[in-house]
Amino acid sequence: MPTKPDSKNQTIFVTGANGHIGNQIVRDLLENGYNVKGSVRDIKDDTKTSHLIQHAKDVGVEERLELVQGDILDADIWAEMITGCDSLFHTATIYSNTQDGQLIIDTALLGTTHLLTAARDAGIKRVVYTSSVAAVGNTPKGRAKTEDDWQTERSSPYIIAKTDSERKAWEMATEFDIDLRVINPSAVIGGGFVNPTPSVDFFPDIVNGNVPMAPKIPLSIVHVRDVAIAHRRAYEIDEASGRFILAPHNNLTLVDVCRTVKRLYPDSKAPKRGIPRSMMSLVVLFDWFNGLRGKKRYMTRKTVKGFFRGDSNISSKKATDVL
């Protein structure tokens, strides 16, 4: 299988290097001989840099990691920073179901525009782009969703942001003649993050018994280290074109996850019972009250309707075969 040349002396620019996926990409690249130039929003904030520096120390290659400061909403800084790198891995975004919706959408779209433009100006020909199965969708029920499928729901700012920004990336890649490879991970679990993402931040509530019954919402899962490896392999393998869904553990629901937690950790208070669909309106109401009390909201009425229109039957066959 033809691959890219030896990683020695190649430098990969990683945006959002401190994020859940980003920091694991940095570690994987360092472990595989690459130089890494990673961007964070505030380079003076140790919480955004210390774990990256530790990765380089663990691998014994501190000299191969360079950290720079950059906000993806700033259009003017990126081309100069990326110039001289061999590829761009664009992971930076706001992954949240609770922050300002328009900010989430604007950050995704503007970040994509700024970074793809910078890649063109810097002469980078191959870009690896982090999207999500949120851009693939969970409909129709009963059929395995593949890379040919696109999200049709507009049920949350995050779903809108990931779908519209990936479409924008493909449009720009065609216009700029950039070889774009897109990774579409499902819910990403596994350690190695500073702040929990929506994929994992409900686990403490599950383990501590704050969720007495779990909603039967569709769920597919992938480990963050597999996501990191997939990004690197998408860059290295010449034939690795297009989109790549990462959902090796699929056809699950949140109830299945809770039962697995209970089986692995019998002393936890994880629920084993699922909430009947007929009671989901009460879940939405309870979630709304939590929002009034300043707690995170997980399930609006619109989000719940979107969940139940589809399932988590999502195929990772292409990624398994190619990457």
PLM regions: where:
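N-terminal Rossmann NAD(P)H-binding glycine-rich loop of SDR-like oxidoreductase domains
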Residues: 10-34
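NAD(P)H-binding glycine-rich loop region in Rossmannoid oxidoreductase-like domains
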Residues: 44-47, 54-110
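Conserved Rossmann-fold NAD(P)-dependent oxidoreductase catalytic core, especially the SDR/UDP-sugar
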Residues: 90, 94, 100-158
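A conserved pocket-lining segment of Rossmann-fold NAD(P)-dependent short-chain dehydrogenase/reductase
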Residues: 151-154, 195, 201-222, 226
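Active-site Tyr-X1-5-Lys
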Residues: 155-180
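Glycine/proline-rich active-site loop of Rossmann-fold NAD(P)-dependent oxidoreductases
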Residues: 175-178, 190-202, 234-244, 267-269
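Mid/C-terminal beta-alpha module of Rossmann-like enzyme folds, strongest
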Residues: 230-299, 316, 321
